[in-house]
């Protein structure tokens, strides 16, 4: 880290003794004390942090104890500084000063300033503004006060109200010697800025000739002053004339001091002094945005903080993939809460530019210099940049600098307005309005009134784009009928000429809120020409949508207000009113408003009706202008208003015509019923629909008849226990649905028709089935009466015939509704939007156990699960749901799909279902129920014509549609190619297989090889098929031939993953299957080696889906969608083509994915029988002729071999000493390898003969057999056969080993003889030590290799992940994480020898699990166990089986194993309240701080005690701290990107750091002491923002590492350790003596202010930064949540909760007990166990009495720690506890999730063997024996290491079947039957 610079004085002081340093610091203290006494009154205002920093940098004194509140503290502090620090120092030297416009109390303060005090003065005030009356008191008079002449005058904050003439007159009259004046005026105005450069200190606005100044941005404190009166800033002198003599007198104007907007001027008679020609201001922490972004913007922003911009730019430059979201997140992190929206948009624009185009480099090439030179010479360069025809963004970015400006002074400066006009001269003087819109943005263009002057042609030229489409909603609503609300129209001046459409404007707030439910007035925007071509922005499109919605609501509102019920009533009213309307071409002049009828309601005239529809619509968009609408409109009439206008003429003739519109029905008769948006309509005619319903096939249900109709047929619909028959919507029901779509704007596609019996009731419910989104729902009351009730209001709605009820979108989430039928035959139609089908799980729940008898019967016959059949034939399942059962037709459909035959015996005889083959079973159909009568034995699984589908979890579709997409994301080196199946190549391999030349189990005559292809039923058919495939049949006429010919017109995409040996070719795809597709039966892996199959099975592929190439061809592939060909080079030539042929014949080729994995540099397939018959081209070259992406690196081979092969390796091991040594024979090689401790795992030979020869030396394999395997060490035999091997086989041999290998001669002669006879190849290069070059190796490949090399750090730097990609979903956290290169320290490897105990055979008596059941009698009734409240009980103990109960039968849950323990759930309010009451304490911040301050001395005392027992050196190890920060970030980023993105809300910078989210942990409390207990309070968890974790977690990790490194051996902390380490500690220190345990009460709550003081003092000793410590104290003292502020306490979920709990536990133990040196003690959070009998002491009682932390002392001979028994033989977990947990998992169907972890706990006790009798009583031994039998019998369920462990332990069991319970064990202190008694001796 970088150290700060220290001056020589600081260096000297740091070396002086402490006493001398204190003497010098005493002087500084006295000086600060005096200064504070003098200035505290004027500089103690509380200022925001940014303002404080600015004042400090400006040299303004601020009191360190700022507490005084003020409305504008910043400007007040600045004024005081100017008065008492600056002005006083200048005017104090005068004997007399006349003071104007200043309060007396300020002058009295200036009297008390010591050396700078003002001695003699007069206060002469006058009233300038209205506030001066109150400011100066009643003595001030409005006339000018007498002011002495030729004296010294000081004017305070008034001169900015004086004009230049007034100041000149004042100087002329009084002729002062010295005039000192303070001026408040933002200087940036004179530089052309319209906004403040110090917005945190002041802001201003310019309104015409006035300047509105707002101190601290507070608008209520603002005052107005003339804009022109800032002339002093640009004046160098003022010239006046003597009234008597007329002589000119020059007064010099000097700017003595300027800070912000406050200035001090000294005006005095001119002397021969240099003038101030330039006044310089700045630099400010801003930059001119216009200098970077020259293009026009919608809303201008002039400045932006430069420091923030630099940090964002540097951050963006450091990202590999900069994006807009990251930049905005960084802006939010760097800014306070008061961030402007314009700044966000600016950063978005900047980041978008960087993301899209990047930034050019700083260095410049020749052509780059030429381009810059050419750009500089361009004429109109700035104009070209503004309109986007040229760009110099990078150079503008490089030239950004802090904002600064100069003001040049003169004797006669320009006025401020003239200066502004001069700066903006281009805009104001330009008459080219097109240029104005480009330069200044459309918004400003409109505001400055440029729009009326722009002609249509000019606008079209400016923004070419697209046509404006015609409106389909009313654009005008002006008529006498709408007179209840003030409605006006607005248009531009060229309205008639441009045929623009006016917009509706509601001037009344009341009308606005009633009509549109908005709260503010609508804005009037000029409409665009209807005939022009204009490109619309997203803003315009959104505005247009809002305008349409507003217009429709307006019309609806007024029609409802007119109280018309139908169209006819509206037509009558319109006729009555229209007789009074007369319109002519000149228009009718009226005062106040336009009287017009809605244009969209008019029918076109006869002439127009003959025209084209487009023209008629265009004409309807034009209306005559009403010239007399208002004075304003009349005044703005353009000179060409007399042009004849076309439009709809609203005369008597037109009005007499019918005024019907197809849209009008939509607005008449509607009634809004409640605020939730419920709408009712009346007067609808559904007689035709009622007639159609009478003829519909409705299903009889309880109290009604019903059916479901869909536009998107077929769909199923059901809910609860009811399902409905489904039909396609046709006829009138379809017409009604389409009409409702148009009327309501909702895409209805389903209708539920129900005919009710009288009195039928539907209770309160919501239509929230999973097939729906929260769209609108329309209920049509076709016939009959009903009452409709909702929860959104209390009124009951009566539904009559023809009524409609619309429940809008979002209604179902918040409200429910109920219906009561009031008449027989009442018919309703409910229209909904059926978005999706029900899930498979929902359908399965509906039919399972009730309607699934057919699926169960067929599944039993064909040995499958019913769910698999349902998934394979989903439409049969849908019919079963709709019809509530299956029929014979469904059975036939299932058999036809599976191509099987099943007999079904029913009431009408025997029926055969299916037509293929013999019957494989018989079913009975009795009483609408299918059951199995008999099942014939069949080789169903081996037939190619049977189908193996996928599981019932929908994995098939998941694999089909998603796998190749996901594979592209996780595998960067994926290769793909489009392949056409080569039939001749496939035919050759097929014939070779049938003839027995290839393979061993595919011969046609002996192994029924004809079963490989679907549709082939005999050998003869297969022979004909082979001839057809090879093209040897001239005119074949069959379906098979047509099927094969289809392949000539198909291309299949093949994917490939290729790489060097050990490069991890299968790693990504295996991880993908393991994490996302595990257990899918839609996957088939084809492996040529048995060991490869084992690897795939461990990675999540079912063993039965891993095939050799022959078994793959003979098996059924119909249910597969993913085919992985591992080591494709070892597959026979033509296999891929034959496999694709087989897939095509079964109809799955198009929807399947094929992935090939292999290495072109390794050995390929070879068989002497078929070598001359099959194609010569290998599979890789055949499929990927254009080359493959190749992983040119390895994780396997050591550095020695990697160097020889010119490849990079991630294996850090250099190589064994015998690496590549050649020994004379095998015994010599074996001897020397074993002597150096290199165990030989394999011997590789070149031929099978050699394999037999060396078989007695151990594991021997040929080069080809070892392909794909990995070993540590081995021997390669050099024989004559090895000389003949290809380089590919040699490559296989030398790349099998991690650590290394040696050679052994296997031929006669010496090493030199062998080397001389070798050919020049890879083997010769390796044996000679020369090595092979990259070119040599790549030249041996059959295809072009596109190398993908790993970026391997040459030193210790390793970048282990793409952190930016991982953080893509959490841009807030991205800004907190270090994204640079990480460095890992590589620790030297050492060999650790660990002795293992000999296993002891153990005889375990057999015990029946039935004997363990009676213990459940200890469970009390639920009413005695639960918490009870006013509104019910808690819900910790289950009594009844829930709907998802998966146990074979529903048992009494009150006696289940889960009922033994309390369960906490998030929705259990009483448990949560109990948790709050027990585990939380509340207090205010002031009390927390006060208590902490009082406890600081106690904290130091506790730290001293702690360090006495755990000595730790004071100071900080910065390297270790950096490493901890790196480890924390790596751990944080080790989660998947999806998981990080899901928690992104925790990274939000707006999350208050002193607030947490509190919730309760959902868990089953399976601790031993919780068995059979009453309800327990929940465990509260705290969720902190990520900023807290990022800040403190690295320091906590550092503390943990330092503590661990310095911890004495006799202390054990169970953190980041496994149980084997705890076992070693117990064996080492446990001696069977009495042990001591501390049982803490409310441990987290008890960690109060005293513990916090201890933590702070200890962490300071550890080297924590003081800033971090202060932040930690603040967090602990101010933390709160929605419930209120917390007292100082510990929270579960807080960073490093375990560490701080452990520290508190340790210091309490050291205070409570006498702990001699060497005493073994285990600590883990609040758990403590001392393995010796410690004596309690009262030495530290005065401290312990102050602690809230209390503990009960427990002495025992059976110590328990973290739920484990500690004994001299190791660890034991209570067997009954494991047994009951297992039973709970079995009850809940979660055995597979927990069996491995429970086995791990069990194994510690199991490996103790006979020694277990010394530690367990007989009851626990019975549990242990039952567990032993369970794990042995279910070992096939174990995975990973557990499977190996059970195999190692299995032989220890020596059961003989006797049920020997042994002797009894009485109560003991800790254990099975009693937790309070002392342990007794075993009675065996």
Curated annotation (Swiss-Prot):
Boundaries of every Alphavirus-like MT domain copy: 63-232
Enzyme Commission designation: 2.7.7.48
Keywords: ATP-binding, Helicase, Hydrolase, Nucleotide-binding, Nucleotidyltransferase, RNA-directed RNA polymerase, Transferase, Viral RNA replication
Keyword Nucleotide-binding: yes
Residue ranges occupied by any (+)RNA virus helicase ATP-binding domain in the UniProt entry: 1032-1191
Region (Disordered): 602-648
Domain Fe2OG dioxygenase: 747-835
Keyword Magnesium found: no
Annotated ATP binding sites: 1059-1066
Reaction catalysed by this enzyme: RNA(n) + a ribonucleoside 5'-triphosphate = RNA(n+1) + diphosphate
RdRp catalytic domain span: 1633-1740
SUPFAM superfamilies tied to this protein: Clavaminate synthase-like, DNA/RNA polymerases, P-loop containing nucleoside triphosphate hydrolases
Domain annotation (+)RNA virus helicase C-terminal: ranges: 1192-1336
An annotated Gene Ontology molecular function: RNA binding
InterPro entries, per database record: (+)RNA_virus_helicase_core_dom, AlkB-like_sf, Alphavirus-like_MT_dom, DNA/RNA_pol_sf, Oxoglu/Fe-dep_dioxygenase_dom, P-loop_NTPase, RNA-dep_RNA_pol_alsuvir, RNA-dir_pol_ACLSV
PROSITE patterns reported in the protein's UniProt record: ALPHAVIRUS_MT, FE2OG_OXY, PSRV_HELICASE, RDRP_SSRNA_POS
Superkingdom field: Viruses
Amino acid composition bias (Basic and acidic residues), ranges on this chain: 611-622, 629-648
Gene Ontology biological-process entries: DNA-templated transcription; mRNA modification; RNA processing; viral RNA genome replication
Pfam family, one: Viral_helicase1
Function: Involved in viral RNA replication.
Annotated protein name in UniProt: RNA-directed RNA polymerase
Organism from which the protein derives: Apple chlorotic leaf spot virus (isolate plum P863) (ACLSV)
